């Protein structure tokens, strides 16, 4: 693959500040221009162009067959592209396909000419061959073919880049039953349980947790920045309990446990339908002057998809179900929404489900329903009141064909809040990352991928603390978590909470060696 790309791009790279290194096309000004040009690049295309992977095989045939439907669907979703961009993408694809067919035909003819010349050389001595009109004609035709290919390869590379830089921004197709519009148009599918009743005004989770000294979020801007937090004692045990409760349930149901890297290349993010180069982005980018193209994952979905990237699985092993607990990092934009509390934070622990299925919507849709059923089972066993939403077109992002969210009731906030999400990405991710399965006959086909939240710890902590709070300030522990905490109630701590001794306080304590104030 790399050799083929180098051969074809050779005449083109010289004029673009590139040189060939070890079979790859390498930009000598890459590190110098990374910070300023990164947002204009497509790492997924570059990854393939440099020979590390095959080019994404987008389903352009379906798009070209029903362009009007694709254009309507494009306008109903959020994203950079609109229906007016579609004709240009299609025409570029068609031109590229015709050019590749022309190149393929010439390459086949070139091979045939080479074989014919070789046969003449074998059957005649050198002096006879040089005088043979057929030999001279074949040599002339060979030179003409090479000349044509030398002109066509750069054109192919230019069209290829033009196509992929736009086509890779196209979203997945949309399920016909998905509601149209923004999040306000979400369709309620199920409502489970009842709102907890209180004989007092319910408090918010942060007020509850600070009095129990199990969450600390104050005075951390100089320690770990805004939207960070500490969990202590029962707070930490609640996190471990939620993670272990979820992992145990899913492993018992046949899921394979995984751990994944927190640092991943941008190509994996883009293959999953995320944009590490967006401005602003929710993805933390590691300093490119030291570590070229490394990013902190905001979900284990990225690492799990990367595990299957450029690999095939056996058909008999489908569907594959993976589960992973990881720390997630998200650069939440400073919109002023939820500035305090655990609802929007920069780091949190989450258990993620990830599935790989065979082709066809039936199999991936069944797995999506299975994941949703497991989510509902987990929340039901935790005793939470929640509702299941069929998310509308503008909430699907790039990769989702269909997406279900679950919102749990949070009494202190006085409203529902999202706690889980489940998406069927069909073959959107697999076509970009080459996640495939091998049939019994040995044929490779693109798989479908499905992902779902198993347990997002901070938001479940909100729902649990606010739903199980008591008038005396204690919090009941749901039976499902009691084995992990060793108690049925979280009560006021027996220890003395930390006392702040830093600046900006009304009455400062006397430090060692400091004279008493008069």
Swiss-Prot record:
Q: Where located?
A: Mitochondrion matrix
User: Is Aminoacyl-tRNA synthetase a UniProt keyword of this protein?
Assistant: yes
Residues in coiled coil: none
Residues modified as N6-acetyllysine are 110
MF annotations from Gene Ontology: ATP binding; serine-tRNA ligase activity; tRNA binding
Keywords assigned: Acetylation, Aminoacyl-tRNA synthetase, ATP-binding, Ligase, Mitochondrion, Nucleotide-binding, Protein biosynthesis, Transit peptide
Here the transit peptide covers 1-34
Q: Which GO terms describe its cellular component?
A: cytosol; mitochondrial matrix; mitochondrion
Q: What is its main location?
A: mitochondrion
Give residues annotated as binding L-serine: 299-301, 352, 453
Q: Which residues carry this modification: N6-succinyllysine?
A: 195, 337
Its PTM note reads: Two N-termini starting at positions 35 and 37 have been identified by direct sequencing.
Q: What class of enzyme is it?
A: ligase
Q: Where is this region: Disordered?
A: 497-518
Name its pathway: Aminoacyl-tRNA biosynthesis; selenocysteinyl-tRNA(Sec) biosynthesis; L-seryl-tRNA(Sec) from L-serine and tRNA(Sec): step 1/1
Q: What does this protein do?
A: Catalyzes the attachment of serine to tRNA(Ser). Is also probably able to aminoacylate tRNA(Sec) with serine, to form the misacylated tRNA L-seryl-tRNA(Sec), which will be further converted into selenocysteinyl-tRNA(Sec).
Share what the entry says about its subunit structure, partners included. Homodimer. The tRNA molecule probably binds across the dimer.
Quote the protein name from its UniProt record: Serine--tRNA ligase, mitochondrial
In which organism is this protein found?
Bos taurus (Bovine)
This chain is encoded by the gene named SARS2
């Amino acid at each position: 693959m790399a050799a083929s790309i180098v051969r074809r791009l050779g005449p083109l790279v010289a004029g673009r500040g590139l040189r060939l290194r070890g079979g790859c096309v390498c930009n000598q000004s890459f590190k110098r221009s990374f910070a300023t040009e990164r947002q204009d690049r497509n790492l997924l295309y570059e990854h393939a162009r440099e020979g590390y992977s095959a080019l994404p095989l987008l389903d352009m045939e379906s798009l070209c067959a029903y362009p009007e439907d694709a254009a309507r669907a494009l306008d109903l979703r959020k994203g950079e592209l609109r229906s007016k961009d579609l004709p240009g993408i299609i025409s570029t694809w068609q031109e590229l396909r015709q050019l590749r067919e022309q190149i393929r035909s010439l390459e086949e003819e070139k091979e045939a000419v080479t074989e014919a010349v070789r046969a003449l050389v074998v059957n005649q001595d050198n002096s006879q061959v040089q005088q043979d009109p057929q030999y001279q004609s074949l040599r002339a035709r060979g030179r003409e073919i090479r000349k044509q290919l030398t002109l066509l390869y750069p054109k192919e590379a230019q069209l290829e880049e033009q196509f992929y830089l736009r086509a890779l921004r196209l979203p997945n197709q949309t399920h016909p039953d998905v509601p149209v519009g923004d999040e306000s148009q979400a369709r309620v599918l199920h409502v489970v349980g009842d709102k907890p009743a209180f004989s007092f005004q319910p408090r918010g989770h942060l007020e509850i947790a600070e009095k129990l000294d199990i969450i600390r979020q104050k005075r951390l801007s100089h320690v770990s920045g805004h939207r960070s937090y500490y969990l202590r004692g029962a707070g930490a045990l609640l996190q471990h309990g939620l993670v272990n409760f979820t992992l145990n349930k899913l492993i018992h149901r046949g899921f394979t446990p995984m751990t994944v890297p927190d640092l991943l290349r941008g190509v994996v993010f883009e293959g999953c339908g995320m944009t590490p180069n967006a401005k602003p982005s929710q993805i933390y980018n590691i300093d490119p002057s030291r570590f070229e193209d490394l990013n902190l994952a905001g979900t284990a979905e990225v690492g799990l998809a990367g595990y299957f990237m450029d690999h095939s699985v056996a058909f008999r092993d489908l569907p594959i179900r993976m589960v992973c607990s990881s720390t997630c990092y998200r650069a939440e934009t400073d919109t002023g929404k939820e500035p305090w509390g655990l609802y929007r934070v920069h780091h949190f622990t989450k258990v993620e489900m990830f599935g790989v299925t065979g082709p066809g919507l039936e199999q991936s849709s069944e797995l999506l329903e299975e994941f949703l059923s497991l989510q509902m089972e987990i929340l039901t066993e935790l005793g939470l009141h929640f509702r299941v939403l069929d998310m509308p077109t503008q909430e699907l992002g790039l990769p989702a064909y269909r997406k279900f969210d679950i919102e749990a009731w949070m009494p202190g906030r006085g409203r529902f809040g999202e706690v889980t999400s489940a998406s069927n990405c069909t073959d959107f991710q697999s076509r970009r990352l080459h996640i495939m399965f091998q049939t019994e006959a040995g044929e490779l086909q693109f798989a479908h991928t499905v992902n779902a939240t198993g347990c997002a710890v901070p938001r479940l902590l909100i729902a649990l603390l606010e739903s199980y709070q008591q008038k005396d300030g204690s919090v009941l522990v749901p039976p499902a978590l009691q084995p992990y905490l060793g108690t049925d109630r979280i009560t006021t701590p027996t220890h003395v909470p930390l006392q702040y001794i830093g600046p900006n306080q009304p009455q400062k304590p006397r430090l060692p060696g400091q004279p008493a104030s008069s």
